[in-house]
């Protein structure tokens, strides 16, 4: 008998089929039609490169809305405490984030601005953001936007195997500043100032650059959650206040 363990992840659901040690990620077709997500076929070359570069397990696109992933079990659960208390492990993690930039930029194509625009495109709900799209573009370009980023770094997407780190879920892979990837990690894992400073020291990326992209992480989280949770969700309402303040103040 095939056993399925499922988990909903917004635009997609993830199923583990225990008979062949494979993980299947099934995408909601609405994410491509209504929210302008990139087609899975656009990721084939990215998946090939992440596997060859030892950044991730093998991914295989098997239909227009399903990918098959080789199951990867961590040696043990990675935690923020373990990551920041183990200097060697932190250096391995940051080296892997640098290695992401070895992916050919020509096959990534998507910019961080386009990622934002895919949510707000012709949507009257986001009128204020649309009105500031040129200022937003200028804000993003404060730092060079030519680094390949994972775009969704958090502990559930990071696996530790034989002192090697692998990343999962490349759906939000974009071209931006390297500070953006670390900002997203800091935002999603709620890092404190001391931990962000440590990231800065070991990565040689300024704290200023990392903090510069934190409002962008708030913005993306807000746009995503309004889709999957609705605007009446408590977290969405709190984020909306922060986003409104940020958008109002960019010039």
PLM regions with names:
Residues 13-17, 136-180:
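Active-site acidic catalytic loop and adjacent metal/ATP-binding pocket
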Residues 16-25, 56, 68, 159, ...:
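Short hydrophobic-acidic sequence motifs that mark active-site Asp/Glu residues
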Residues 29, 65-84, 102-105, 121-122, ...:
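A glycine-centered beta->alpha junction motif in the catalytic cores
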């Amino acid at each position: 008998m095939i056993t399925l363990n499922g988990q909903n992840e917004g635009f997609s659901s993830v199923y583990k089929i225990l008979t062949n040690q494979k993980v299947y990620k099934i995408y909601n077709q609405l994410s491509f039609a209504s929210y302008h997500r990139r087609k899975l076929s656009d990721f084939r070359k990215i998946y090939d490169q992440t596997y060859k570069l030892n950044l991730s397990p093998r991914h295989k696109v098997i239909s227009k809305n399903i990918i098959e992933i080789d199951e990867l079990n961590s040696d043990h659960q990675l935690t923020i405490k373990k990551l920041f208390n183990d200097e060697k492990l932190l250096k391995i993690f940051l080296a892997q984030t640098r290695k992401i930039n070895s992916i050919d930029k020509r096959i990534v194509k998507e910019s961080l601005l386009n990622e934002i625009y895919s949510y707000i495109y012709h949507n009257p709900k986001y009128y204020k953001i649309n009105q500031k799209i040129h200022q937003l573009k200028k804000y993003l370009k404060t730092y060079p936007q030519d680094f390949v980023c994972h775009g969704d770094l958090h502990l559930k997407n990071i696996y530790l195997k034989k002192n090697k780190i692998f990343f999962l879920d490349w759906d939000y892979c974009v071209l931006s500043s390297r500070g953006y990837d670390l900002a997203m990690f800091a935002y999603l894992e709620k890092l404190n100032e001391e931990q962000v400073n440590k990231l800065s020291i070991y990565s040689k990326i300024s704290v200023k650059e990392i903090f510069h992209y934190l409002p962008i992480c708030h913005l993306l989280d807000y746009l995503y959650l309004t889709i999957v949770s609705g605007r009446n969700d408590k977290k969405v309402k709190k984020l909306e206040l922060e986003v409104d303040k940020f958008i109002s103040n960019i010039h």
